Amino acid sequence: MSQTPGGAPMAPEAMGCHSTADMAAAASAAGNGELMERFKADYPVGPHDKPQSMCPAFGSLRTGLRMRRVGTIISGSACCTYGLSFVSHFYGARRSIGYVPFNSESLVTGKLFEDIREAVHEMADPQRYDAIVVTNLCVPTASGVPLRLLPSEINGVRIVGIDVPGFGVPTHAEAKDVLAGAMLKYARSEIEAGPVQAPVSGRSDRPTVALLGEMFPADPVMIGALLAPLGLAAGPVVPCRDWRELYAALDSGVAAAIHPFYTASVREFQAAGRAIVGSAPVGHDGTAAWLAAIGEAYGIAADKVAAAQNAFLPAIRGALAGAPIKGRITLSGYEGSELIVARLLIESGAEVPYVGTAAGRTPWSAADREWLEARGTVVKFRASLEDDLAAMQGFEPDLAVGTTPVVQKAKSLGIPSLYFTNLISARPLMGPAGAGSLAQVINAAIGNRERMSKMKAFFAGVGEGDTAGIWEGAPNLRPDFRAAHQKKLEKAARAAKSEEMI
């Protein structure tokens, strides 16, 4: 643990968000070594040891707040909790978030854990909640606050404790897996202990395929239609919206890793003896391969699989042909669906030389990676912002699809751009419905090249270099000061050069 100038240990809350290595070491020293090793195995880091996007805990917090009859408690620094609460409600949360404050004394003495336990007991009302999720942020995790010692159940309310530190979970997308995996593990233990309640929607009369990864609401419906000719049905989407959906998900014979980074969730499905199928029914080739993989996993006859393919592939081919995309596109994001979106763009006619995803590489993304690389696309897992910007500037695309800073940089260069999360991933992607869904927004954006050029010319020099920042009046450039300083630099350089000769 870091020390103060006097030699005393530095409290973890004094380290801040950028003391990643120190906090990780502190967490291991405080008894969370096994947790940190699990994070390293599940979510290997890339070139950066800290997230370059939103705080990871936002992902688990958001999915927890979407669940019915599930309460939320956060243990973390006040500034972090405020920010997470604000952004969660900004994105539509309609539920209060419980918060357990702390200080250096309560961290050191263990009083924080007692406060958390007291808060959980106070909140555990079976009339209101099926479960309560308690989340440790960076400082409590680094201090070793042991959520695993909380009761697993209070008054019939399940207690799920998770650690989501920024120094262990690289992206907020993967934090969704941390919570989903913990809930699946709890639900699996309930199933092993005896009968459980059926989902509110009831049990399917056909074998089901659980779907891993948040997706556009129409996509599970489309996947269900694709599975129907095989005698199958779409199961729950994980992360779930109701606790009892977890039982139905684990009851599925196959789990489809639509988003391939759900490592902890996959581990729970495998522990339950379920087969895992990667990729997604996206585009012509993706749908054909995915249906074949599902058929193989369920042991369905080849002729039945072929019939299902023949029922949908012509429609997908027609939709792709009817909504062509022409242009070069670089693609990057942190949602985990970047590779399947790139496949859809390429089958629509676009050239995609680069795909960067902040998610890590897993076996469940192998089919998509191989398909893309066979078509000349550079696929970068754990891509950094620097990777994405270099690709955009190097490939000079007609359109850059990416995260906010990528879009910002593209606009400054006069390159049309789209924000991946709001404008691309929030659209249907699966089957015939997804085949033509991107053309309108993509082609409209590519058509803005001339407008972007005019805007760049009009604002040339504004807010750049010496004029950057906020000025109440005209920027005070003082070229005379610049010239005088340049002369000093040149004189110093000449003096250094003459000393080298001596």
UniProtKB/Swiss-Prot annotation:
GO molecular function terms attached to this record: oxidoreductase activity, acting on iron-sulfur proteins as donors, NAD or NADP as acceptor
Transmembrane segments: 70-87, 131-147, 221-238
GO BP, sorted A to Z: light-independent bacteriochlorophyll biosynthetic process; photosynthesis
Catalytic activity: 3-deacetyl-3-vinylbacteriochlorophyllide a + 2 oxidized [2Fe-2S]-[ferredoxin] + ADP + phosphate = chlorophyllide a + 2 reduced [2Fe-2S]-[ferredoxin] + ATP + H2O + H(+); bacteriochlorophyllide a + 2 oxidized [2Fe-2S]-[ferredoxin] + ADP + phosphate = 3-acetyl-3-devinylchlorophyllide a + 2 reduced [2Fe-2S]-[ferredoxin] + ATP + H2O + H(+); 3-deacetyl-3-(1-hydroxyethyl)bacteriochlorophyllide a + 2 oxidized [2Fe-2S]-[ferredoxin] + ADP + phosphate = 3-devinyl-3-(1-hydroxyethyl)chlorophyllide a + 2 reduced [2Fe-2S]-[ferredoxin] + ATP + H2O + H(+)
Coiled coil listed as a keyword: no
Record carries keyword DNA-binding: no
Alphabetically ordered keywords of this record: Bacteriochlorophyll biosynthesis, Cell membrane, Chlorophyll biosynthesis, Membrane, Oxidoreductase, Photosynthesis, Transmembrane, Transmembrane helix
GO CC terms in record: plasma membrane
Subcellular location: Cell membrane
Pathway: Porphyrin-containing compound metabolism; bacteriochlorophyll biosynthesis (light-independent)
Membrane-topology descriptor: Multi-pass membrane protein
EC number(s) given by UniProt: 1.3.7.15
Domain of life where this protein originates: Bacteria
InterPro entries for the chain: BchY, LIPOR_BchN/ChlN, Nase/OxRdtase_comp1, Protochlorophyllide_Rdtase
Protein family according to the UniProt entry: Belongs to the BchN/ChlN family.
Function: Converts chlorophylls (Chl) into bacteriochlorophylls (BChl) by reducing ring B of the tetrapyrrole.
PANTHER family: LIGHT-INDEPENDENT PROTOCHLOROPHYLLIDE REDUCTASE SUBUNIT N
Quaternary organization: Chlorophyllide reductase is composed of three subunits; BchX, BchY and BchZ. Forms a heterodimer of one BchY and one BchZ subunit.
Protein's recorded name: Chlorophyllide reductase 52.5 kDa chain
